[in-house]
From Swiss-Prot:
Record protein name field: Putative uncharacterized membrane protein YHR069C-A
Subcellular location(s) per record: Membrane
Keywords: Membrane, Transmembrane, Transmembrane helix
Domain of life where this protein originates: Eukaryota
Main location: membrane
Entry keyword annotation includes Membrane: yes
Note: Completely overlaps TRM5.
């Protein structure tokens, strides 16, 4: 999966309050559900714009179908420059790729200002 070895960028108007970056690592279960392996790790930087979400959707579709089970570990940091606070949310997303995409978009919409960092 060399296509994910470098960090892709989404171009467009970047506002400091709307820029985020994240790293996600997808684990895919075998057909027997006995072991898991690291399929790919991608770092993506962009803005909360439709073209970025479309890119993310295409990436997840490329990673697999509804038959695959994936896990994304998440760390979100939100920096409010007006009062210099950093908020953190940690959690995990489990499920097939369409479910994860839906939940990830919801999370990104929730953290639609400041910066968000997603880490395995």
């Amino acid at each position: 999966m060399d296509s994910c070895s470098s960090t892709p960028f989404v171009t467009g108007v970047l506002l400091p309050s709307a820029v985020f970056s994240f790293l996600f690592c997808t684990l895919v279960s075998s057909s027997f559900g006995l072991d898991e392996f690291n399929l790919t790790t991608c770092g993506i930087r962009g803005t909360l714009k439709m073209q970025f979400l479309k890119f993310l959707e295409n990436t997840l579709i490329f990673l697999g179908s509804g038959n695959l089970t994936a896990h994304i570990g998440i760390l979100v940091m939100k920096n409010d420059l007006s009062n210099s606070r950093i908020w953190r949310f940690t959690g995990g997303l489990y499920g097939n790729t369409p479910d994860i995409l839906h939940e990830l978009i919801n999370l990104l919409n929730f953290w639609n200002t400041g910066s968000a960092i997603f880490m395995q």
